[in-house]
Each structure stands twice: as C-alpha cells, then as structure tokens.
C-alpha cells in the first residue's frame, strides 16, 4: 500500500472510513454465527428460563434456583429476543454480532480519546480495535448466545468511560448501572477511570470518583441482598472450579498458572474450548510447578508499575484494562464459579490488543511497509481462526466434539459428548464417553446417572441400581437435577420390587420439585400397587396437571376407570 494513500485513509479527515472498516471486518468474521443453533448453556439461561420465556418484574430482579445470578439487563435482552424470535436463534445471534461490533467501535473511540496526545495515537487505536474485532478468544462470547453478558457489560463500561472523559456525569452513571446489571465484573470501573485519567494527566473533581464508588458500593449491597446474603454460588462446585478446594496459598498460585494460560490463548488461540472444568487444567500443590508462574506474574506487574510511574499512557491503559478486567474472575481474591472461561477474557483482551498495537506502532516507525503487512497478515490469520471456530458453535454435537479434542482430560467434555450420543441412540459410543468421564472423575453425578440409565435399558438392573444410587448420593439438594435423579433412582427401585425405597425417594422429589410429573405418576403407581386407589387417582391427576402428555399417568387413570386393564409399572 502506498504510504500517502494509507496516511490519507487513516487521517482524521477519514475517520468515518475507519468506522466502516471495523464494522465490515467484524461482520465478515462473525457472519457465519447467524447460522448457528442454540448450544450448551443457551438452553439453561434462555429456553428453560421462565424469566426469559414468561418474563415478570420479579423474575428479573431475583436470582433463580438454577443459577444464582443477578443480571437483569442481560436477561431482559434475552426476553426481548424471545418476544421477537421465540425459539428461532437467528435474532439472538444477530444481536450478539451487532453488540460485538458496537464494543469494537467503543474501544476504538476510547483509545482515540485517551491517546489523543500520543504521537500516532489514532493508528494505535485503529490497530487495537481491529485486532479486538477478529481475535478468536472472543468466539465464545459472540457465538454463544449467553456470552452476551460479557458484551453488554463491556459495551456499557466503555460507554461510561467515554462519558467520564467527556464530563457527562449523569449519563456516565447511567451506563455504569447498566453495565453492573449486565454482569458483576463491571464493578472494576473505578480503577479503570482513575488509571485513564492518570495516563492523560487530567484528573476529574474528587466528587466524581466518589459518585462512581458510591454507585458501585450500592450495587454490591443490592447484589448481596438479592442473592440471599451471599455472593455467587451457595458453594462452588468442585467440578466447575477445583481451585476452590485448594488451600488459599495454592489456590492463588494455581490461579496465576491459569492466568498464564489466558496469555497463551491470546498469543496462540489454537486449541479453544467451551469447557475448562476439572482436569482440563492440571493443578499442583508443588512449588516447582507454581513458583515460575508467580515470578513471571510479579515481573509483569512490576513492569506495568514502572509504566505507571513513568506515565506511559498507552502501556498504563493496556495494563489497567487487562488487570482490572480479570480482577473479579481471576480466583485470586475469592474463588468464583468457574476456573477459566474464554468468555471471561472478552473485556480484558482489549488490553492485550492495545499492547500489540503499541508494539506495532514501534515497528511502523522503523519499517512502515513491513508493519502494515504484519498487521494485515495477523488480522487475517486471527479472523480466519475465528471463522473456523464459529462453526464449532453450530450445534451441541459440533461444540462437544471440538471440546473433547481440545481438552481430552476434561471429565465434563466427555460426559457432554456422551449425552449427545445418548440422545441419538448410539448407546455404545455414549457409554464409552461416560466411562472415560468416570475414569477421570469417579464421583461425577451426570456420568453416573447416564451410565445407569444405559445399563437399565440393557437389563443390567443391579449395575444400573448401583450407578444411580451413587449419582443421587453425589447430587446436592439445591441442584436442579436433584428431583429428576431421585425419580430415576425410584423408578429403578420400583423395577426391582423395592417400593418402600422408591416411595421415600419420590416423596423427596415432590418436596423439592413439585412440578415433576414423573414423580407424581410413579408415586401413583405405587399407591395403586398397594390398593390405595384414591391416592393413586389424585397423584395421577396431579401428574397430568404438570404434564398433560405423561403416558404413565394416562394409563393409570384408564386402568382405574376400567378395572380389567392392567396398570403401568
């Protein structure tokens, strides 16, 4: 490219073309997500979430039993999508694509503003935003519909930051509240605003920061209240975050190792995964494996503090975004609900992209042609990887298949893959995956349950009973699967003639999940066996109220109306 043309194209006179470039690139890279279906957590957070499918004010303002989250703006956006597109995923993916484009533009505008006095600051801003637009680590946030919380929080946070720089305090605080109500990670805004003002050498009046701190503190108080006097999960699931089971020292040291894994994926996003649960990442209580990560982290922090002291505004901004962005989810202060997730790197990665842009500008000063070629090649390679990765999110089968390849040590990845085989009737392949999952984590309730159901289908009743008993034993009462597992185990006890054990389990299931039609229907059958016809009739009718198509309850009521008919077992 001729340097004069490039200079004109990227000059202040042509800023609209930079915006067009960023929009076009973003759309080209993520257009194939519009073909994707609902996948993985989309079913829990959207399709099976009454706050989305039957929204009420109460539903938005309190966490559900299934997931102790307070993100009303995010769930409101899903509800609006539901009102427009119902179970058709296109509109959901379209909104995600547009949100990513908006966040990219906001990042560009923020960098332009903070770096406006820096030589070639506009080039840095463009390069950073371009790399952010195409980086494959963002595919989980964009291609997974529930990743929208990351983009909403990042977008409103960047908007609040821009408004802060432009002294629009009321709108700044409004955007901050919207960011916080999108995802709790937006609580990092105060240190970001301070770092940005320090880098520019223009602090705002003190009361401006007090307002930010006050709004953030108020949000934290509300979060604590609506989550029942606690933050996040009642207790962190070992499978989701094994870091939580380690002593504090080893948890922090291993969290630093995980932090370097994020860096590795930012540098080389080759093996990307939707899952990093138990055994996807090796953890150590050994200084030989943890000390190097700690030393490297201290060195990086010291380098950033030096940049802070010397007021190198680009480096200060990059470090602030990266460190503050990961502060809530790093598992260093307190354990969170997950050990690692690529979606969690969505906002922090902007700091990494800015760092690359700063290094690129240095190269540009030495060899402009080489620098432009390098940027084009790098953006092209990252964009191509994103396009390929987007296809992994097409269906659950493609996603889980890719997960098993990327993290073969993950018990959950194998269990999820087994679930896909089970749904398609491939029992042998399913059982192989479940057995692999149990070889990695023998106490995995999901793998135990599904293995038991397969053995039951094959007539291996005793083996099935043992597996289902273990699955139920390792299931917490607050789990959404508790009632269903109680029913499955009860059905197995009924099959082998142990009705007393089955009755006790069904009573528990009805207590925990009174809308479980199978629990009522199975209990009705036991009452029928015992000659308690009236109780059998009441339970069967209750089952049909919960699920009018329940075949067991239908057959039982037919048997009660026609005494010569045999009741279901």
Mark where each language-model region is.
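Register position in tetratricopeptide repeats
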Residues: 423, 457, 495, 529, ...
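Structural marker of alpha-solenoid helical repeat scaffolds
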Residues: 406, 440, 474-478, 512, ...
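Polytopic membrane enzymes that build or remodel cell-surface glycoconjugates and lipids
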Residues: 2-461, 469, 483-484, 488
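Canonical positions in the second alpha-helix
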Residues: 403, 436-437, 470-471, 475, ...
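Alpha-helical adaptor scaffolds
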Residues: 453, 473-500, 504-506, 518
């Amino acid at each position: 490219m001729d340097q004069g043309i490039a200079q004109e194209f990227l000059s202040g006179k042509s800023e609209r073309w930079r915006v067009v470039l960023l929009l076009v690139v973003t759309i080209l890279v993520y257009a194939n997500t519009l073909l994707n279906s609902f996948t993985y957590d989309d079913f829990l957070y959207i399709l099976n979430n009454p706050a989305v499918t039957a929204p009420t004010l109460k539903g938005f303002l309190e966490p559900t039993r299934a997931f102790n989250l307070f993100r009303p703006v995010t769930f409101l956006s899903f509800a609006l999508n539901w009102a427009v597109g119902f179970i058709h995923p296109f509109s959901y993916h379209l909104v995600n694509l547009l949100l990513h484009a908006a966040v990219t533009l906001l990042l560009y505008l923020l960098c332009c503003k903070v770096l406006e006095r820096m030589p070639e600051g506009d080039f840095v801003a463009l390069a950073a935003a371009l790399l952010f637009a195409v980086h494959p680590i963002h595919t989980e946030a964009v291609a997974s519909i529930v990743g929208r919380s990351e983009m909403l929080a990042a977008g409103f946070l960047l908007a609040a930051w821009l408004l802060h720089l432009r002294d629009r305090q009321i709108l700044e605080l409004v955007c901050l509240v919207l960011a916080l109500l999108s995802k709790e990670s937006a609580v990092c805004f105060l240190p970001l605003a301070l770092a940005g003002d320090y880098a520019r050498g223009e602090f705002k009046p003190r009361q401006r920061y007090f307002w930010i701190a006050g709004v953030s503190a108020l949000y934290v108080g509300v979060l604590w209240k609506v989550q029942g006097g606690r933050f996040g999960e009642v207790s962190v699931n070992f499978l989701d975050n094994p870091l939580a089971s380690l002593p504090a020292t080893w948890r922090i040291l291993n969290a630093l190792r995980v932090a370097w894994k994020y860096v590795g994926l930012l540098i080389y996003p080759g093996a990307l995964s939707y899952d990093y649960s138990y055994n996807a990442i090796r953890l150590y209580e050994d200084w030989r494996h943890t000390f190097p990560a700690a030393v490297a982290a201290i060195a990086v922090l010291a380098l950033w503090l030096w940049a802070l002291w010397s007021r190198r505004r680009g480096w200060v901004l990059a470090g602030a975004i990266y460190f503050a962005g990961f502060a809530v989810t790093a598992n260093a202060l307190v354990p969170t609900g997950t050990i690692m997730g690529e979606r969690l790197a969505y906002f922090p990665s902007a700091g990494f992209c800015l760092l690359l842009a700063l290094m690129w500008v240095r190269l540009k000063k030495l060899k402009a042609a080489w620098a432009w070629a390098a940027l084009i090649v790098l953006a092209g390679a990252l964009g191509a990887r994103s396009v390929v990765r987007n296809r992994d999110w097409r269906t659950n089968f493609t996603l889980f298949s890719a997960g098993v390849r990327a993290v073969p040590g993950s018990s959950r990845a194998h269990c999820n893959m087994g679930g896909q085989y089970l749904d398609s009737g491939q029992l042998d392949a399913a059982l192989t995956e479940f057995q692999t999952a149990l070889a990695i984590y023998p106490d995995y309730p999901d793998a135990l349950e599904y293995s038991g159901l397969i053995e039951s289908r094959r007539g291996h009743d005793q083996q099935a009973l043992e597996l289902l008993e273990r699955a139920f034993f390792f299931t917490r009462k607050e789990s959404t699967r508790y009632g269903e597992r109680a029913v499955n185990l009860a059905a197995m006890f009924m099959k082998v003639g142990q009705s007393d054990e089955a009755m006790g389990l069904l009573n528990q299931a009805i207590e925990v999940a009174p809308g479980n039609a199978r629990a009522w229907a199975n209990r009705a059958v036991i009452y029928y066996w015992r000659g308690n016809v009236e109780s059998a009739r009441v339970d069967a009718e209750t089952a049909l109220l919960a699920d009018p198509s329940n075949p067991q309850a239908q057959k039982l009521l037919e048997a009660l109306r026609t005494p010569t008919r045999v009741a279901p077992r």
